[in-house]
Amino acid sequence: MIKNLHVTHFPLAPWQVVEPDRTLRLVLRVASGMIQRVECLNCDPCDTELDASGAMLPRLEAIEVPLTYNDSEFEYYVLKKRMETHKLRYHFVLYSLEGTFVLDERGVTQSAEERLIRPFFVSFVFDDAPQPAPAWAKDMIWYQIFPDRFRRGAGKANWNSDPITDRNAYFGGDLKGIRDAIPYLKKLGVTGVYLNPIFAAGSVHRYDTIDYRAIDPGLGTEEDFVRLCDALHENGMRIMLDGVFNHGSWKSLEFQDVAERSVASPYLDWFKMTDPDAVKSFVSGGYVGRSPYNTFAFAPDMPKWNTQNPAVAEHLMEAAEYWTKRCAVDAWRLDVPDEIHPSFLREFHARMKQLNPNLYIIGEIWSDPTRWMSEGLFDGVMNYPVYFAIRDFFLLRSIDAVQFCDRLTRYFALTPESWQEGMFQFCSTHDIPRILWYAKGNRKSVLNCYQMSSLFPGGISVYYGDEQLLSGGFDPDNRRCMPWNRVGREPFAAELFEQIHLLRRGRVKSISPINDDSIEIRLQDGQLPVCMSR
């Protein structure tokens, strides 16, 4: 019987989380239909009393744990309890038709004697626990712009939205063009603009930053950027920048100095060099063979920064502080932060929040974000787990409704509410094929995906052109030019944003399959359920 319970709980995130308001969230997962009731017996470990025999016993409080979520295999019992002191001990009592069981650090047993109990513990809760995302972030409708492909300033030639095969092609989009498009964005109901990198770089994507204190001349000047930020703020929109602090460019002053002077360079420790003497010949020789330094994704033109070096950290953070203050930047999205040392992320978060406590910081994390969220390194992350579930069900059709609902139920059960509020939802980005490409041109599928994504807590982002049914496969084709010739003639844009605004008012409470291709979504606050079919 014990084996059949398939009980899961760990005294660590995401199964045990103390939220910013000091609410303890405990999650217990058991096999469906095996348990009738669950109690959590808990108290401060120092809260004790003597019994009649003189034995020291804890003053345990029994709290019934509600069944909160269930999928096709498991039931999730979620307890929310205010932490009245700084520590807690607890164990679970599971009631079934077969008997009563105890879950503690020993596992599942039928031994409930206090002298044998090995309770779980909530470690000391410090007053500087991670804070929630800024309140404004959860209501945002972002619009992501790849600057070179969005819009050219007045006086420049037209372009088209043909498929792109040349990864290095420049089309001339700039900051003035983005500013000229603000009336278009405002009409759609966009409340924030997320810009891919804009600093001086050696490529069209600009993820190979040469100078973090300079705007790329292909996009404009610093004054152009200041005017863009001012115009966005004047129109009630926020601005989010892409912070590429994991790696830089081989053209940067610091890297070129290492290439020229090898071990004599003062910047030697700014990078992770395996053979400093070979750098110059490797770069000048056309990158033949194995790189003598660490890079991002085996790309020799993007050497990795040594973010454990205090001088490197200061160099990068000073630049972020400069732009945050200069242009009242509202948010930062950090590129590949899973490769950046946590000490850098921790200091970045602290310094940015010191500048502006309402600044929003997200990370590009493609997998389970528990490690970063539990440490308070980000306010949220790009919500790839939810994106992949939506893509697999509605677009690839690689899973049925049961599997889709199971994945999303696990997400809700194992993602604390304070984390959910800071998430960044999306259906397309510069890193993945566009949603219309996956949908094979089916606009209903595009609408379904954005509708589904809109129901999740956190902000939602529309990748430029999705609303105009712009297609595009894998990089670089997902970065086609914005089809301005369709604006005003394509009714889908208004329909898409109308649905996003409408569904942002709801929040998913539970999701269940109707049949292989259809789902029912129950919303919080007693709103009518939503049914969707792919």
Model-derived segments and spans:
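Hydrophobic faces of well-ordered beta-strands that scaffold small-molecule active sites
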Residues: 141-143, 193-195, 239-241, 332, ...
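Active-site groove signature of glycoside hydrolases
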Residues: 245-247, 315-342, 425-430
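Glycan-association/targeting regions that enable binding to alpha-glucans and other polysaccharides
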Residues: 1-138, 191, 355
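Loop/helix patches that line or flank the sugar-binding groove of alpha-linked glycan CAZymes
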Residues: 137, 153-171, 181, 406-409, ...
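Active-site-proximal helices and loops of the catalytic beta/alpha 8
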Residues: 229-238, 247-262, 325, 335-418, ...
